[in-house]
Amino acid sequence: MKIVISGASGDLGRKITALLLQQVPASELILLTRHPAKLAAATALGAEVRKADFDDAPGLERALRGGDVMLLISTLSIGKRVQQHTTAIHAAKAAGIKHVVYTSSCGIQPQTPSISGKEHYATEHVLQKSGLHFTILRKSWYADVIPQLLMPAAIAMGTIGFSTGNGMVAPVAKADCARAAASVLANYRTHTNAIYEITGPQLFTLADMIAHCSTVSRKPIVYQNLSHADKQAIFDAMGISRDYQEGMMNDTTNAWASDEMITYEMAIKQGFFSICSRHIEMITGQPALSFAKVVQLHRASWDQQE
């Protein structure tokens, strides 16, 4: 069996690779990246690293040859990624891959206001019509975002705001997303044409999550229930581009295109993320981490920022 992982040098790709190396021989892994040098350690362990670019269809098909199942980690290129994902799916089929596992998003409905949600919806449609076997992992909002990326500034300023209203989300640990993906890949034949909701174990409003973090930090943090226009004005004042710019999103920042972030919050407010499942436990045999546990895991970094 040969498992292909796209975007293998990204944070999620690395986490999934590390877990797979505990389950299958390294020689069964084909890791795709635009920057092979970043995966030198995996090469040393015996994994095969291949250069691949979703904007280069012929090269991508060559890179996929010999694979049995591919993990298609959604790209960050808003506006381009439906075409990139379509290219990858067609290249996979041409290369002889039989099964594609795709990292999608919760709340995938044609009516979603979320820009990324619409792109995931379109990609899912292409994949389901491709003739390939598939597994779709619809990830909820990362539970790590607030405690890892937003809390240091919230503690310093004493306030934070979202335009999600009373909308609810079941935040999921990125580590759990990696666990679910690795388990599906290692046993992909048992997940044929399945769609899973990859969520945390409990629904919260954003205000609930901030209140919990405030209690844990022992710092007063005022939650602001903002309008979408107010939130857009904040992003504009921060100089965040409304449109996606290549390279603006990475593993240490949450500064994505503001139009995407605003429409994502709209989707939460309108109830598209009000989904809570036990699919992680069903897939992996272990329950998903609670939001409180994820906060605990990141708590020490707040002290370093104070």
Predicted regions and their residues:
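Short loop/helix-cap segments at secondary-structure boundaries that form the rim of catalytic
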Residues: 38-45, 62
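Residues lining the SAM
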Residues: 6, 73, 103, 285
